Amino acid sequence: MNSKKITLANNIYLILAGLFITSLVASNLIFTKIFYWYPFDINLLGVKLFELSVGILPYPLTFLITDLISEIYGRKKADQVVITGIFASIFSIILIFVSSQVPAIDASPIDDETFNSVFLNAPLAVLASMLTYLFAQFIDIRIYHFWKKLTKGKHLWLRNNFSTFTSQFVDTFTIVSLLILFGILPEDKFLVLVISGFLFKVIVALFDTPFLYLFVWIFRKKFNLKVGEEIKLS
């Protein structure tokens, strides 16, 4: 691969990393808002099935990005993006905390109480979300490469979905458990929240599989990659 293509591959990697980090940080900032998504009118234990945090919306994109990076750039580069995303999340929390300590003036359109209620609501939840997410992403990457090696780079849909389904279940189950343990969510909502969150992520994962195929095809054509071949960046 010539230097021009290596530069292009590196630039695309940085863009994907930027999208990943932005999605991760945003999900940790917006998770307190709850929305409803009712493709099916289903009640479980008296609760509508798809009542979800808006923080769940960017998550499927992050798993699509790490799967794409895993496929094209390899496991090491995927791990680097995940670790960088965690540091970015921690840094964003530090910035928010520092901002909360600066008193708002009377003319400020946002007073201290409003600012703190939005950005400092349940810091334990943010911490739990980040730690759980880190765990789930590393599971996703390792399962993805296990299937990639086992199938010799074939059956992209298999490793994409198997890795995502497993890691998303771990993520959903663990975060809901921790939020209930911290007293942030009621215990009687455990089953509904786990099922709703996991099913939503599964549905989105199934829909993103064609996009993964498309992006992988574009990469292979642009960089003349064989099935299972990865771009090696320094």
Language model segments and positions:
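Short, highly charged, low-complexity non-transmembrane loops/tails of multi-pass membrane proteins
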Residues: 218-234
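Alpha-helical transmembrane segments of multi-pass membrane proteins
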Residues: 21-37
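Membrane interface segments of multi-pass transport proteins and intramembrane proteases
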Residues: 147-160
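Transmembrane alpha-helix/helix-exit interface in multi-pass inner-membrane proteins
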Residues: 89-108, 129, 133, 137
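Membrane-interface interhelical connector segments
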Residues: 98-124
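Central hydrophobic cores of alpha-helical transmembrane segments in multi-pass inner-membrane proteins
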Residues: 57-68
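Transmembrane helix-bundle signature of multi-pass membrane transporters/permeases
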Residues: 85-86, 134, 157-169, 194-201
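N-terminal membrane topogenic signal
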Residues: 2-18
